[in-house]
Amino acid sequence: MADQRPDPDQLLNRVNAEEARAKRGKLKIFFGASAGVGKTYAMLGAARQQLLAGVDVVIGIVETHGRMETEVMADGLEYLPLRDIPYRDRVLKEFDLDGALARKPALILMDELAHSNVAGSRHAKRWQDIDELLAAGIDVYSTVNVQHLESLNDVVSGITGIRVWETVPDKVFDAADEVVLVDLPPDELLQRLQ
């Protein structure tokens, strides 16, 4: 008669994998069809709800693009200081991954998931920074447009005639714990972009 007991190594591997998943932060993506539909605004609104519920929320990086209503929504939220990175003949401000890991908030806002970091950063892409934050047990809210997804980049480019070069691997999007669709009727979007 064959031994029906489970393999102890397999059990240990399964338990370790489940513990790692339980400790990993959660990723929530605010997803839109184009710039200007209100992804950042929606992300800030959701973050404010978490703050009211007592969650330790900080802004890692948020791009308001000069929109007053978005700037107002960010008022009162803690901003992590950005890091100065010398680049050619100037100094650029970039997200400070080490500062965020040291601060270890419960939730961090990281706008523009597809952003390419400045040379000299630890990771080439913001989504890689986010993966490190998640691995450290920090929940992350981020934003992305459809044309930035690797598998849809060519399709959207073929329709719009505009190619974007900053993309996110589909596996990053697929691994999100939650995706919130943010959209506007076309005439409202056109009015907002004027």
Predicted features and spans:
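Conserved P-loop
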Residues: 24-102
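Conserved ATPase-coupling elements of RecA-like P-loop NTPase cores
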Residues: 112-127, 151-154
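Loop/turn-to-beta-strand initiation segments
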Residues: 56, 104-107, 136-142
